[in-house]
Regions:
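N-terminal Sec-pathway targeting helices
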Residues: 1-13
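Short, surface-exposed "cap/lid" segments of acyl-processing enzymes
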Residues: 58-122
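Serine-hydrolase catalytic core
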Residues: 72-73, 230-299, 314-331
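Alpha/beta-hydrolase active-site loop
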Residues: 132-157
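Residue in the alpha/beta-hydrolase core beta-strand immediately N-terminal to the catalytic nucleophile
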Residues: 163-165, 190-192
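Gly/Ala-rich beta-loop-alpha elbow adjacent to hydrolase catalytic centers
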Residues: 167-172, 176
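Conserved hydrolase catalytic core segment
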Residues: 178-189
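Active-site nucleophile loop of the alpha/beta-hydrolase fold
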Residues: 192-202
């Protein structure tokens, strides 16, 4: 039922927006204070040029936050954590709390247009500035940011002489995976992926029809408490998502065949479980396992099946089981 509603909502939203779209697609918000290409170096750019551009745009100040493990004597791993599309990066904290409790340091990154990752200027409303950054983003921008975050994680892991882990939800999982497959110097020892957006139900690609209007905002059906931009998601962000999926389909290779645990609700409104299983089989990813999530009875009615990132979205007991499975997977063959 929930999946049907999501599909109908997608159809209705796309049709309505196509009917009523006008020249002023920014809905009263202008991009005067932001340069959409300011964080988008070419793929051939060297690491230092990427880093310089990011620093100029306040990246290191606003796009990542470290959380250190509670074990002062031993760190068992260092994890890169990336959130989903138009999701508050802080919503990854329940996962991070379990990681740090288990002896894993975590770097929680915010993609451009999410959390505090936007150009901060005196006298400019934060919500508007964040949304403008969201409307100006591209998949390459997000990839560059994720790469910079990975370098920090790798450096700390090397210093501690511990494994590098990757934790990604939805869009975040896609970006981390594509980074792994595409960049020769990126490597994760183990991964835990939550509803990875590497496959979508075909109906959602209807949003591609809105590509000529990148600044147009598509309203979201998700609860405000999860949304980093409550007004909705810009078409530009959806285009970036589709670009990422397309890129990953081309780049996916045997390099990503490391111990990986995928958490997915079979009733997910956006990610087809069958598509994930087919991908694993086609790419011969014999170290990947799928963990089917069944939400508990204590979950609020109407909660998206795609949301499996905290106790509120899965149920308290189910969330505990998910976290136990995730940490057991990441810390395999290591003392707990």
């Amino acid at each position: 039922m929930k999946s049907t509603l999501a599909i109908l909502a997608t159809l209705v939203t796309v049709l309505l927006l196509l009917l009523f779209v006008c020249d002023d697609t920014s809905f009263g918000l202008k991009s005067d204070n932001l340069n959409g290409n300011s964080l988008a170096p070419q793929k051939s750019a060297d690491k230092q040029s990427v880093k310089n551009i990011a620093i100029e745009n306040q990246w290191e100040t606003y796009s990542s936050q470290w959380f250190y493990c509670n074990h002062q004597k031993e760190t068992k791993g260092v994890a890169l954590v990336i959130h989903g599309l138009n999701f508050r990066p802080t919503k990854m904290k329940p996962i991070i709390a379990k990681l740090t409790e288990s002896g894993v340091d975590a770097l929680n990154m915010s993609l451009r247009g999410h959390g505090e990752n936007f150009t901060h200027q005196d006298g400019v409303d934060s919500d508007k500035a964040r949304l403008e950054a969201f409307k100006a983003t591209t998949y390459q921008v997000w990839t560059n940011e994720a790469y910079l975050a990975y370098l920090q994680v790798r450096e700390r892991a090397a210093h501690k002489e511990v494994p590098v882990f990757f934790i990604g939800y939805s869009l975040g999982a896609l970006i981390g995976l594509d980074l792994f497959a595409t960049y020769q110097d990126v490597y994760y020892d183990r991964m835990a992926l939550f509803a990875p957006a590497i496959k979508l139900y075909a109906i959602h690609y209807l949003a591609r029809l809105l590509s000529p209007f990148p600044e147009l905002i598509v309203p979201s059906l998700a609860p405000d408490s999860y949304l980093t931009n409550k007004k909705g998601t810009p078409v530009a962000a959806y285009d970036a998502l589709f670009d990422g999926i397309n890129n990953f389909e081309k780049s996916a290779n045997s390099k990503i065949n490391v111990p990986t645990l995928i958490f997915i609700d079979e009733q997910d409104e956006f990610i087809p479980t069958s598509g994930l299983k087919n991908f694993v089989e086609e790419k011969k990813l014999d170290q990947w396992q799928i963990y089917t999530v069944q939400k508990g009875k204590d979950v609020k009615f109407g909660t998206f099946h795609h949301h499996i990132i905290d106790a509120a979205s899965t149920g308290k007991d189910v969330w505990q089981e998910i976290m136990n499975a995730a940490t057991a997977h990441l810390l395999n063959d290591r003392k707990n």
